[in-house]
A protein has these predicted regions:
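Short glycine-dipeptide loop
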Residues: 52, 75-76, 144-149
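A short SAM/SAH-binding and catalytic strip from SAM-dependent methyltransferases
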Residues: 119-133, 156
């Protein structure tokens, strides 16, 4: 019960955060496929989704993958897109427009059920948000056609300095800055990613690694944008630091960014992404 209670609390917190940050996330990242969002094309290529397919976009967010699926499946295909954030779905609906064969559903991925059987399921940058990913994956498997394909993308564990430069430093001042449950980077290697999917009963697993580049601008732009767009729970923790602590933290983060800083003062980060495909057999 303790784990279930922790999972429920985490899910509620995640929904609240995404309802808050979805507009910024869409504008800065998803809408223009910035940095790691360049992986969307790779994910769809690896999915081998065809015209007339029936597809489920799991944790669709603000609709980046969903929007591209419309052309992939054509007018005779069908797309269901689910997410737990009402704010994200609202943006996705507006962005994708009035498409007759596309349906958005606000739902819990552990419990959602469709009478439809899917040829393919896509999930970009969301698996790590599920506190019980096995429950989600097994639920997805039940709704897939035999020999159907699931395709997922996650951030790498070791080569994503955009996050690490700040988070490694912040945790020295605020050890509980991020929730310890679930671990957000637990699928960030080919081995751990494959193992999770295999444990859910999938087979013919293929994982590919891609490295993208992303520039947040100068250090000041990187630092100020991070602070500006913190979700409420993180902002409260960050603001609990003294002025002196914040100044020290800023310098620690700046030191970590130096190896990625070009002569013109702009930071260019590498960003590792893993994409996995597997079969329901």
């Amino acid at each position: 019960m303790k784990k279930d209670s922790k999972g429920l609390k985490y899910k509620q917190r995640t929904i609240s955060v995404w309802n808050e940050v979805a507009p910024f996330y869409h504008k800065r990242w998803a809408k223009n496929e910035v940095g790691p969002f360049g992986v969307t094309k790779k994910l769809l290529d690896m999915s081998k989704i065809k015209k007339n397919n029936t597809v489920l976009d799991l944790a669709c967010g603000t609709g980046l993958v969903t929007k591209k699926l419309i052309r992939k499946v054509g007018s005779k295909g069908h797309i269901n897109a689910i997410d737990s954030s009402e704010s994200a779905i609202k943006i996705a609906k507006k962005w994708t427009g009035d498409v007759k064969n596309l349906h958005f559903v606000r739902a819990d991925a552990e419990k959602v059920h469709f009478n439809t059987k899917f040829d393919s399921i896509t999930c970009q940058y969301a698996l790590f948000f599920f506190p019980n990913e096995q429950k989600v994956l097994k639920n997805m498997k039940k709704m897939m056609k035999e020999n159907g394909t699931i395709t997922l993308a996650v951030h790498g564990k070791y080569n994503v300095p955009y996050f690490d430069c700040i988070l490694e430093s912040v945790k020295k001042f605020i050890p509980d800055y991020l929730p310890k449950y679930p671990e957000m980077d637990r699928f960030g290697t080919k081995e751990t990613f494959s193992a999770a999917i295999k444990n859910a009963g999938f087979s013919k697993i293929i994982v590919k690694k891609f490295v993208f580049k992303y520039s947040p601008g100068t250090f000041s732009e990187y630092w100020n944008n991070y602070k500006k767009h913190l979700s409420k729970p993180l902002k409260e923790k960050f603001d609990s630091l003294t002025k002196f602590q914040k100044a020290n933290l800023r310098e620690m983060v700046k030191d970590k960014t130096l190896e990625y800083t070009k002569k013109d003062g702009k930071i260019v980060f590498p960003w590792e992404v893993l994409v996995l495909t597997a079969k329901n057999q």
